C-alpha cells in the first residue's frame, strides 16, 4: 500500500459509496436526516467523510445505467461518475456488493501504489453465488481480491464467505435510526380481540404466502399486510387486508395499530427483515419471525419468537400463544428492547463499528507497509 493507507496527518478521509438515489444532499432533504444507514455519525475531527453523489441523467442514460447494473451486478457508471472522490479517499466504505465490485474495479484500473483501502460489505451476493455463471464467479473473486476487509451483517453470511471465497469476514450489526423510531417502553402489553397482526416489507425474501395461510379466515386474528409487491391471494379472506403503506407516518401508524409484528421469510443468510424487526422492537411490539437469515445474531429466542420456515401452522399458533399470555409477552418485549440497547443496534452503533474497523485496517496496512519496506531494504 502507498501513503494513503498510512495517513497520519489530519483526519482520515473516508468515502461512503452508496447506491444511486440516496445522495445525502437529496435524500429526505427537507428532513435533514443525513446519510442513509447513519454513516454520518462517524464524522469527527479525526475522520472526515465524503459521499457518493447522484449525477443528473435523462431517461435514456438512466435506462442504460440500470441495464448495465442488472447485467453486471454492480453500478459501473455511478461509480465512474464518483471516481474523483473514490480515489482521493484513504478508505472506502460500501454497503453492498453492488457498490464494492465497481469500486474494486476502479481501484484495480488505477495505476500506482497510492490507493485507498476498501471495506467491502456483502449482503445478497453470497445467497446467489452458486447460481452465478462460472465467468461471473471468476471475475467477482478477482475483484474481491482488491478488498482489504470483508464484512457481512450476519454470522451466516460470514460462514459463506469462508466457504466460497476462503476468506475471513467481520460481522457488523445493522442498526436503526432512533430519530425515525424512538424507543417506546411499555408498562403492560394489552392485546386487542381479535388479535391484530401486521407484516410489512418489500424484500424479495418475504414469504407472504405463509403469512396469509397462517391467518386468513381465522376469527382469532385480523391481519394487515403492507407491501408494494404484487401478492396473490388464494382465497377470499375478510380478515386480511393487503395494501402498501406510503411514507414514514403511515408506517408508524401501522406499528401503532398492531399487537404483533410478523416477519415471514424464505431461506436466506443476509438478515432479511432486520429493519422491520428493529422497528417493531423500538415500537414496543411483540415480534414473531422465521428463524432464518442470521436474525438470532441480533435477538435471542427469549426476545423474539422464531418459527420454522414455510410453516403457517407454527406461525399461527405462536402468535396465538403470545396473545394468550400478556404478561409473558410483556417480558419478551422488554427483553428485546434490553438486547437492542446492550448491542447498540442503532445507526450510531453501526457507524461506530465502521470507525473501529477503519482504524484496524489502517493499523494493519501501516504494519504491512513497514514489513515491505524492511524487505525491500
Region annotations inferred by a language model:
Residues 327-358:
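A charged, aromatic-enriched C-terminal amphipathic alpha-helix characteristic of glycosyltransferases
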Residues 234-235, 292-306:
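Short acidic/histidine- and often glycine-rich active-site loop of Leloir-type glycosyltransferases
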Residues 261, 282, 286-289:
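Short hydrophobic beta-strand element within catalytic cores of glycosyltransferases
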Residues 34, 189-236, 241-249:
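Conserved catalytic-core segment of nucleotide-activated headgroup transferases in glycan assembly
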Residues 80-88, 132-149:
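Membrane-proximal helix-turn-helix segments that form the acceptor-binding/catalytic region
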Residues 202, 301-313, 320-327:
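Conserved acidic donor-binding segment of nucleotide-sugar-dependent glycosyltransferases
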Residues 159, 163, 176-193, 234, ...:
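Acidic anion/phosphate-binding donor-loop and adjacent secondary structure
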Residues 249, 263-278, 291-292, 296-297:
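Nucleotide-sugar-dependent
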